[in-house]
Amino acid sequence: VREMAAESWPTGDTFRPDVCVVRKSGQDAYVSAPLSSIMAGETFQTMLLDTSGVPYDSYFLSDILADEELQDYRVYIFANTRYLSEQERAAIRDTLMGADRWLVFLGDSGYITETGPSAEALSQFVGMTVTTDGSYSRAPAFVDVQHALTQDVPPFQGMSEFLVGLMTQSGQSSFTGRPQRFEIADAAATALGHYEDGAVAMATRNLGGWTSVYLGVPNSLDGAMLRNIAEEAGAYVLGAEGHETHMSGRMVSLHARKTGPVTLRLPDGTERTLDVKAQETYWIDLQGE
């Protein structure tokens, strides 16, 4: 499709983000409830990414592993990769885990193997020891650690838990089902947040050649944390944090969520400041036409 589009509508656009969201089809089959807070919460997680001020691409894992051009992003976010074959795990290790990249893993990334669920396999995949007793519980993350990755991150994280709060005013729904809890139990990892009982809910670890960020709570990658990760990884950050932004090398679209001045840091190194009004959408031409 990309090749057909390029032939029919050549743009000369050479801009590409430094961040890539990794997705895999068929992952909902491994979630017990057909309309769970994990699955529905992915919509809210996407909203957090879109308002982070960090441009990103999104590709299926199969496309990334088949195309060398998709294997040199600075940051990869594994968003819904519950089931991974041994072949896929090996390919990810060989192609993505190196070159000083940052890999971010959400919740149950890599938990399901060809022989069933495995906390050991998840631990090996994310690069730090993760445990689970298989139970389901209220599991928000409290960001209570001062760290470069937690700067400006609100103290309560977990969009699935947020969704449960919206859906539990009365009656029962599969939306009210709590997710399986994953805890980090790795002395070599640096904690970024905890569960209510003090267990580590999110952490980071430098693995010598690449850095892992693991968030045990589903859909808990806040926009501010993504922005911090991008800056630490040397990835491009547009700015306009808190507003919804999308961009190419030709234009930026910005949907304002609040009124006031907004500064965009453009790919050519210049800055552009706009006075925006809440709920209005703006298009910024980057080619000077």
Residues covered by each model-derived region:
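Aromatic-Pro/Gly-enriched surface loop or interdomain linker
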Residues: V1-D72, T115, M128, A199, ...
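Short, Asp-centered acidic motifs that coordinate Mg2+ and/or phosphate
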Residues: V75
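A conserved amphipathic helix/loop scaffold
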Residues: A79-E289
